[in-house]
Amino acid sequence: MRNFARYSAVKDLSMKQTFLYAVCGVILVTAFSGCAGINSLLKSGQPELIYSKALEYYQKEKWSRASTLFEGVQHYYIGTPREDSVSFFNARCKFKNRDYDTASALFDDFRRKFGRSAFIEDAEGMYALCFYYLSPGPSRDQTMTGQALIAINEFMSRYPHSDRVENFKQINGELTQRLHDKSYLNAYTYYKIGRYKSAIVSLKNALKQFPDSNHREEIMYMIVDASYRFANNSIANKQTDRYLSMLDSYLSFKEEFPESKYTKEVDRMAKHARDYLDRNKKDEDKDNNI
């Protein structure tokens, strides 16, 4: 009985493997057939046939195959009324395949060559979206975010009534916030590792660049704290000026956030700074009276 069960299990496994091999074989044959068909088309020298098949793949959303054919037929249509169509469809295939680097280059080329094309609005919209999709999180370099913002704002200025505008407004807010976060993270890094002078400069720049940042309260608190620590760690003849600067930051913070969760901490720092300044003034008065 055990031998029979073992035989049945082995037989079932063998049948499953055979089925999988058959499926894989069909997939490979189909793929090779598709490639062979595309290569034959490209070698046929019949641009109308190639273009027609490219459109067929395009409509079926087989982006890679469509792109291969559009690229292969493109040179036949240079200088003809169909040139912009081939260029646009090929760029959109790259976009749909999430090859945003290539798509952005193709759309950029398209918008420079075919400014009067019926596809120009869509091309410029997808050109902007390429940079949006290439834009990384705030912890990484934000060059693409900057390019996305430029392209998106140019699009909204050029096509104020486009269906894309509402979506682009949301994206604009999202990307701007990403730059806020990047600026904040850069400043916070200096603060966290104890480079308080650099932190103060970076934090103040962050506020200057993005006055409406949702990190504003925390940034202003860190300016007070970094200024306090910077003054506290300074040599004696630098401390007075640095504590005075810290108190300026403290007063700005208190004026803007009188009910802040950081109130007790900044009040404690301010008291210490004032106590130091009072003691220092008394010492100076004594020296002057001698």
Predicted regions and their residues:
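Acidic, polar-rich low-complexity tracts and alpha-helical solenoid repeat scaffolds
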Residues: 4-9, 19, 31-290
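Sec-dependent N-terminal signal peptides
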Residues: 17-26
